[in-house]
Amino acid sequence: MVVAKKSLGQHFLTDESFLDRIVNALPPLNPLKLIEIGVGLGDLTLKLLDRYPLKTYEIDSNLCEKMRSKLKAQKKPFKLELVEKDALFLKEEEPYFLISNLPYYIATRLVLNALKDPKCRGLLVMTQKEVALKFCTKDSQNALSVLVHTIGNATLLFDVPPSAFSPPPKVFSSVFEVIKEPLKEKALASLTQVPFFEEALQKGFETLEDFLKACFSSPRKTLSNNLKKSVSYREKLDKVLDFLALESQPTSVRASEVKDYLKLLEYLLKG
């Protein structure tokens, strides 16, 4: 019997109907590799192996051993490459699509890593519902929604109740999808002077992420007040106010009311 480790945020999805819904929600992958974070009890992994070759990152050595035993007992049409490694250090050389039931405590960081990685072309993940809603809202309500929609499109697919897991978490989960868009990536990469596209895209993402942290540091305060506290951006406050005037927005706007953060950042970086 496998006991979930609280230290790793383990809640294993066991409900067959939701496992099937996740697999069926995958978009066409060819020619992308499919990468999974977390093997869990192997239920999702085994279903994926009925349709696709798969590479899975798993930090828990006990779960890796259980998965190897299951694969010896169950022959699957496609092969699994099981990597016993922390997914925070995931690095792929070829384009891939990411799928995972992400641990709650580290889900946001793993999604942001995937968004920043030029090799990741999209993702289908399950997180705490509150986190999924932050990523998928269509306006600028928070920094996560701005980041994800600057590089692609995020869609909330369905909710998963606590009863679908073992052990059951205290909150609902949600499955959402992100598909990256090359034109948006090109615009983000153009923020930097880095000559190579993939490096420029990563640098552009990091620059925007850093800027948004300053803008949303105190969401209830005005954008101006937040930037006054930022060592990196306080000297650019006058340019921010100029931009707001050009966009016919009041200087008292909150961060959630800014219409186009990429355009604003481009304006600030001009000189």
UniProtKB/Swiss-Prot annotation:
It is an enzyme of class 2 (transferase). One of its GO terms (molecular function) is 16S rRNA (adenine(1518)-N(6)/adenine(1519)-N(6))-dimethyltransferase activity. It comes from the Bacteria. One of its GO terms (cellular component) is cytosol. Its EC number is 2.1.1.182. Gene3D superfamilies: Ribosomal RNA adenine dimethylase-like, domain 2 (1.10.8.100), Vaccinia Virus protein VP39 (3.40.50.150). Disulfide bonds: none annotated. It holds the Pfam family RrnaAD. It is found in: Cytoplasm. CDD domains: AdoMet_MTases. Specifically dimethylates two adjacent adenosines (A1518 and A1519) in the loop of a conserved hairpin near the 3'-end of 16S rRNA in the 30S particle. May play a critical role in biogenesis of 30S subunits. NCBIfam families: ksgA (TIGR00755). This is Ribosomal RNA small subunit methyltransferase A. It comes from Helicobacter pylori (strain P12). The lineage of its organism: Bacteria, Pseudomonadati, Campylobacterota, Epsilonproteobacteria, Campylobacterales.
